Amino acid sequence: DTILTLWLGHIPEHAQIFVRLMLFLALTDAISYPLITAILATGDIKRYSLLAGGFNLLNFPLSYLFLYLGNPPECTVIIAIIISVGCLVIRLIILNEKLGISFNQYLKKVLLNVIITGIISSIIPLILYHEIMQPIVRLIVVILGSLVSSLFVIYWIGCTSNERNFVKMKASQFINRFRK
């Protein structure tokens, strides 16, 4: 609310839910990008483009239909999220056929990891949000708390030991640049 108030002054009726839904849509799309890259690397671009592109084309007519039937405007973003998840499933099916990537393995190693990391890293910012009443101070503290909480949880829970070693190596290289 604070960011929207600072940015817009007066918050339009559906702005808050739109922003939340758009952030969720961005997350679902971000999870898909590595899958898109893997599919393109297999060379099966035509089939992927027909399936995912065709499925994406449903966005406009479905949104129009749902708005025509009297649903609230945010239904368009919900439809986009459903289509994005559908495209994610299409990508996983293609990758299973081409590279043998298991749907269940992807759910466990990627999606479950993202969900658990997201939930745990949200605990401290939510506590801060409910404990601090001054809007500007709350905004700054919640942003900093989110940053610290997310970095900590991603590093210790979201990363494998190999990924943590990679981060340590890169951090060490970065620090050593300034020691010279």
For the regions a protein language model found, what residue spans apply to each?
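Short membrane-interface helical motifs at transmembrane helix boundaries
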Residues: 1-10, 65-68, 127
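Conserved short cytoplasmic inter-helical helices of the MFS fold
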Residues: 2, 11, 43-47
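Membrane-spanning helices that line or support transport/gating and their immediate boundary helices
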Residues: 2, 6, 34, 163-166
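Membrane-interface helix-capping segments at transmembrane helix termini in multi-pass transporters
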Residues: 4-19, 130-141
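Short runs within selected transmembrane alpha-helices of multi-pass transporters and secretion channels
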Residues: 17-67, 72-98, 117, 121, ...
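Short, amphipathic, aromatic/basic-enriched membrane-interface segments that mark the entry/exit
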Residues: 43-51, 104-112, 136-137
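Membrane-proximal transmembrane or re-entrant/amphipathic helices at the cytosolic face
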Residues: 96-103, 107, 125-180
